[in-house]
Amino acid sequence: MEIGVNVPNFGPGTDPGRLRDWARTVEGLGFDLLMLSDHVAITPDVAEQYPAPFYEPFTALSWLAGITDTIRLGTTVLIAPYRHPLLVARMAANLNQLSGGRFVLGVGAGWARQEFEALGVDFAQRGELTDELLRTVRDAWTNDADYRSGDIPIWVGGLSTAGMRRAVRFGDAWHPLRQSMDWMRNALGVLAKIAENEQRALPAFSPRILLRLTPEPLDERVAGEGSIDQVIGDLNQLEALGAEAVVLDPFIGDPAETERPETAWSALATVMAHRGDK
């Protein structure tokens, strides 16, 4: 099972030097994936969770590709309705080629209503627009040589039944974000039923989970939260459930965290040290 990191490409203190330090730290610790989030307009609803500055993921990942060697690079997740499908197909193909085949395209439908309004995109149509993007990107990569650049895995986010159906229809992997172990275990059963009804192969399971280490175990928590033993237990359970990859998200929610990445780096190092003891 691969383990990746959702690197904060936003917030106070984030600049090219900080992104470079993140990339070198994550690759140096031996992680398999480095992934970035996506927002275009930092409207109030976005800023509450992801404050400015915000580095556009394709741009930032292209730069990070040049200062990393082997770590895979991806989006968790690109908000599909914000960009023309053919632009995404070309940017993804170009980035995959420039990085030596290391790109993973994670896609989601989005949630920030004010951001949709600022961009002139119909929030109510976000599911349909996401389906259309995935359909168009797949078609461009398959049928137009100008867009081809090796195999690019598509991870589809979404927690609803519609999101799971989208992952079955268009994705190489289903990429749920920040849920409990019980929720994911039950949802995998739903995903399998959807795949059966759609008469399609079951996509891989590649969740993104929180990473928050606490001195003592927690009773109520989501996956990736609690003592190091609890977090390692979650990773072991996810591996037993068949997870192909797990992305750790060390951003807890305090904007000041992006100014002090050393805490996150320490947590990531602790996880890798304990995983190495398996």
Residue ranges and their predicted role:
Residues 1-278:
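Active-site-adjacent structural elements that line small-molecule/cofactor binding pockets in enzymes
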